Amino acid sequence: MPIKIPENLPAAEVLREENIFIMTEERAAHQDIRPLEIVILNLMPNKIVTETQLLRLLGNTPLQINVVLLRMVSHSHKNVSQEYLDTFYKSFDQISHRKFDGLIITGAPVETLDFEQVDYWEELKEVMDWSKKNVFSTLHICWGAQAGLYYHYGINKYHVSKKIFGVFEHSVSCEDSPLVRGFDDTFWVPHSRHTQIKREDIEPIKELMILSESKKAGVYLVERKDGRQVFVTGHPEYDPEVLKKEYYRDLKKGMDIDIPVNYFPHDDPEKRPVVRWRSHAYILFNNWLNYYVYQQTPYNLDNIDQAIL
């Protein structure tokens, strides 16, 4: 089944070219199905790129999904016009009265700041607090995962001496969770961050469970045991060229940056990157939508309060 998004959203044309089914609102209205209601809090600077990455993964399921794009009004956006935001994005005030099956909180290029120094931190806290009673399951990505763990559980992030940058091998730490069904024994995920969370800070918290780790990139996948919160420290949604663009961007700035590991053939930036993580990304998002959203959320979203008690 398809995702339902605004007809003129730029990401829609890209997804159509990739043969991903986009449904118009008119056609969706004729299907006697309650679609999943998913809100994406997009904190990344390049809105269109991130929209496309996430919608691509959400569109590869047998479920009909209505997508709402959410922005932080307390942040001044430099890489997208106000007209674009007004056309395609909602403010929290516009959606706070609603309930949703799922929420995705993206990463953001603010990890070197203390959480309280981020200009939209107070607004983000409001969204995360609201999600506890109005969203059935929330998927946090990269800095979004760090922010969620810090806000909900007091788990802080730590700076690393060398940027964790490249595509890293991971393994499953707990096979009991539905979220890791279908994962290979070892699988690959992109990471691009200057900070990390630590296993020893997570283990004492009885509500949380570490599902996957990497020897070199650290803790990757954490969930609340009831599936209502999922924390992903990497970027499984990344397009093939993202790390390449980040590498050349940092070089242009004169930064001391290493070639992303396990990415370019023979570590040659002139060669086309090797994509090792695509199938893992699809499985992860499919599992989250199927096991933690579709199969668990009540048919009537107004009953979410009772379902999550």
Swiss-Prot record:
Keywords: Acyltransferase, Amino-acid biosynthesis, Cytoplasm, Methionine biosynthesis, Transferase. The record marks E111 as: Important for acyl-CoA specificity. The record marks S192 as: Important for substrate specificity. Signal peptide: none annotated. Pathway: Amino-acid biosynthesis; L-methionine biosynthesis via de novo pathway; O-acetyl-L-homoserine from L-homoserine: step 1/1. CDD domains: GATase1_HTS. GO terms for cellular component: cytoplasm. Substrate binds at K163, S192, R249. It comes from the Bacteria. The active site is at C142, H235, E237. Its EC number is 2.3.1.31. It is found in: Cytoplasm. One of its GO terms (biological process) is L-methionine biosynthetic process from homoserine via O-succinyl-L-homoserine and cystathionine. The keyword Amino-acid biosynthesis applies. It catalyses: L-homoserine + acetyl-CoA = O-acetyl-L-homoserine + CoA. One of its GO terms (molecular function) is homoserine O-acetyltransferase activity. It holds the Pfam family HTS. Belongs to the MetA family. Transfers an acetyl group from acetyl-CoA to L-homoserine, forming acetyl-L-homoserine. This is Homoserine O-acetyltransferase. It comes from Petrotoga mobilis (strain DSM 10674 / SJ95).
